[in-house]
Amino acid sequence: MPLRSDDRRRRREAVQHALEQVNGERLADVRAGVMSGGELQRVRIAQALASDPMLLLCDEPLLALDPANAKLVAELINRRRREANTTVIVVTHEINTILPYVDRVLYLVDGRFRIGTVEQVMNTETLSMLYRADIQVAKVKDRYVVVGEDGGYPL
C-alpha cells in the first residue's frame, strides 16, 4: 500500500528533526560512502531516533565520534529516554561519556558480570572480582580511571 502524502510529509519531518538533533542537516543528501566515520555514526543515530522507538538498542553509539559529538549523542539519547519514556540499552567501551545518564550498569568480563548502580559496579572491589586481578578504580572529575596489574585501562 503506497504512503499517503501526509504520511510522507510526517516521515520527512521526523528525519529532518532527527538529523538536526545530531547536527547532521548537511548530511541528508550525502552518500554514506563519502561520509567520515563520525558523520556516518551521527546519521545512524538520527535514523534510529526518526522511527520513534519505544526500545532503543545502541551498540557502540559513540564509536568514531569526537568528544563534542560523543557528548551531544549521549545527551540526545538521555533526553530521548526521559522525554519519550524510551527504554535504552547501550553497549559501549567508552563508559565515561554514558555513565552520568544511566540508571543501571551491566559490566561484563569473560562471562562474569555485575549489575547495579554506577557506584555499586564501578569500584575497586567489584572490578577486581570481575577481572580476577588487582584492579584500582579512581574517580577523577566525574570520570573513572581503571588501573590493572598490567597498566591502565582508561574508561
Language model feature labels by segment:
Residues T92-H93:
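H-loop/switch region of ABC-family ATPase nucleotide-binding domains
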Residues D7-L27:
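Conserved ABC ATPase "signature" region
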Residues K71-E83:
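Helical segment within the ABC ATPase nucleotide-binding domain
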Residues D52:
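Conserved catalytic motifs of ABC-family nucleotide-binding domains
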Residues L130-L155:
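ABC ATPase nucleotide-binding domains
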Residues R31-M35, E39:
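Conserved ABC ATPase signature
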Residues L56-E60:
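Catalytic Walker B motif of ABC-type/P-loop ATPase nucleotide-binding domains
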